[in-house]
Amino acid sequence: MAGADPPLPAQLLTQSTVPVIVGPTGIGKSQVAFELARRLGGEIVVADSRQVYERLDIATNKPSAEQRGEVRYHMIDFVDPATTFNAAQYVEGARSAIDDIIDRGKVPIVEGGTMLYVDALCDGFTLTGIPPDPALRAQLERLDATRLRERLLAQDADPGVDLHNPVRMIRAIEILEAAGPPLRRLRTRTPPPWTPVRMGLVASLEVIDRRLAERSRRQVERGLIAETQAALDSGVPENAPVLTGIGYAEAVAHIRGELILEELPHAMARSNRRYARRQLRWWRRDARIRWFEIEPDPLPGILNYLE
């Protein structure tokens, strides 16, 4: 896919459109976005809930130093991993970055796999657009109505939901955890001033699973355990959002003695396979996405589609 082709004219700017590349984890979105940015003279706005965190690079699949030296990236490496970061903060930062890129005469290219981030950035927030969080729901369902009410009101003093209905309160907390307060903001969709051109990368499940297995093995070989241990030693708690994500969660289990080294990459691959299928189900419902096969090379078709 790499080459020395000269940048293409930036016709996209005059049309107020922004290329958006989505797809399941491990499909190769980052490389395609990098090549597209080289051809269009663009900059990449990453839509990944874990790449925002500093220092943790391996299981978050951040772009390489060589890629960052050639193409400018936004929305990565700026949040302390011991803290939390929500979708509302992401949208604010990403929209600001896109405006700045356009103002400087460049082409912004959105690339990422975090479903909520992409949808909120391109469409504006909606209550129904925030997917369920089964783990959080299981935790909240153990609380009585009084404790649910206390937790909800601590996050949003005026949530606008029935404070005697546990089901409504659980859903409200779930949304607030993902998007941030206040809930009333999410009842009015605010789309961006530009038009997203949605493109998805796809392959057979066999190809996706093979890529995920290979990536998991490489991540362990690159030093995933040492990177995870360094984060823990620096004070990042085990339950920090970035360390509960795929790759780091399994590495933490290994460090605790709960998962043997030989099983580590297989456990990571299994978690990634489940996540990839969830991503595919989510995006296949969106008829606005134009799909491109990742093999042998989607870039020519993408360039032709954009022109």
Task: Label each residue range with its predicted role.
Residues 1-307:
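Phosphate/pyrophosphate-binding catalytic cores of soluble transferases and nucleic-acid-acting enzymes
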